[in-house]
Amino acid sequence: MRPRPALFAVLTSLAVAALAGSHAAAAPVTDTTVVAATDTDGDSLPDAWETNGYDANGDGVVDVDLPAMGANPKKKDLFVEMDYMSGRLASTAALDRIVQVFSTAPVSNPDGSTGITIHLDAGAARGTKYDLGGGNEVAYDDDLNPSATQTNALKAANFATARKAVFHYMLWGDSYDGGCSSGQAFNIPNDTFIVTVGQKCNWNATDDTNVGTFVHELGHNLGLQHGGADGLNYKPNYLSVMNYSFQLGGVLKSDGTKYWGYSNVQPTSINEARPDETAGLGSLGAGYRTSWKCPDGKTRTTTGAANQPIDWNCDGDTSDTTTAADINGDKTTSVLIAQNNWANLVFGGGAVGGGTEPRTKTPASELRELTHEEALALH
Ligand SMILES: [Ca+2]
Ligand SMILES: [Ca+2]
Ligand SMILES: [Ca+2]
Ligand SMILES: [Ca+2]
Ligand SMILES: [Zn+2]
């Protein structure tokens, strides 16, 4: 049997004291218990939850059995429950690719390993490997509108309340808010997102579409923006699926392969007031190709490695060093700053986690046991 949580032990002793016949009024119970939980691996899931399971309401019964689900207190874990509309759930091959993006991440752990273990829960739909008992199909709705309200309603009806502190919730849907956006994460960071590359807007989603969009939206939950630490999109030195240039087609590697994860390098910044074409992305661009915007609004992509000179202003040469160019196409002149995403993930968005932050637990007044007075009144 697992050790009982401390709060349960306190309530039990109070109840025993009451039943022992004390006529003194019980001391008022403080209404909030704040616990700074130990989180050795920094994934926002306290060691106690990852070791013993999570008891959401302090009744001594584990509600989310984290160790049985594969959690490790010394390695970063992410849990994602996936609900889905008919035909929209990603394939097993796509889910395998998502897992691989995280398992191969350049993130170190206290147990000496690298990578993040992502636990995807599709219920029974994709076999035991992706079944943690939570994911399920929901009614088809080709337009979640308004998206936040309708997503929250589906979450409330299809996601166990006790999971809120552990699992991110996502939905494989069709479209939302009358538009054709590929997805939505509602907040940065957050605990909820939707992937909406469905039939209504003729996405004809492939595994690539689903993998790129899932990883992108989850990235918002993990604190990442379209420019890394800022919202500037299409920065050629930001080699991440968080960049719209690479969400659906992958980050382009110079060896011809594609990468479907978050950036693991931070190439040199580019000053659009006087970008140095001869420098390309600098030495950290060697393993990549990249894309940027020309003055005519069209996207151009390097044919070779991005540490080579790049024609940022699209005038046919790669020798300009003092000519302004709007390289990310946003009609402003900025310094384009990249980010190493993996070094900047925020765990514990929304309601997820206890982590190193003091966490307000359920008020003890809501866990109130039967009082002696009430017990006597029953007879
Ligand atoms: Ca942890
Ligand atoms: Ca962990
Ligand atoms: Ca040029
Ligand atoms: Ca610009
Ligand atoms: Zn986005």
Language model features by range: what are they?
Residues 1-28:
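Secretory targeting and sorting signals
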Residues 29-39, 72, 76, 81-239, ...:
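Active-site-proximal segment of zinc-dependent metalloprotease catalytic domains
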Residues 40-48, 58-64, 316-320, 331-333:
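Glycine-aliphatic tripeptides that mark coil-to-beta-strand junctions in extracellular
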Residues 45, 53-71, 108-112:
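Short mixed-charge
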Residues 50-51, 247:
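Disulfide-stabilized cysteine-rich extracellular repeat microdomains
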Residues 262:
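Acidic (Asp/Glu-rich) catalytic motifs at the cytosolic membrane interface
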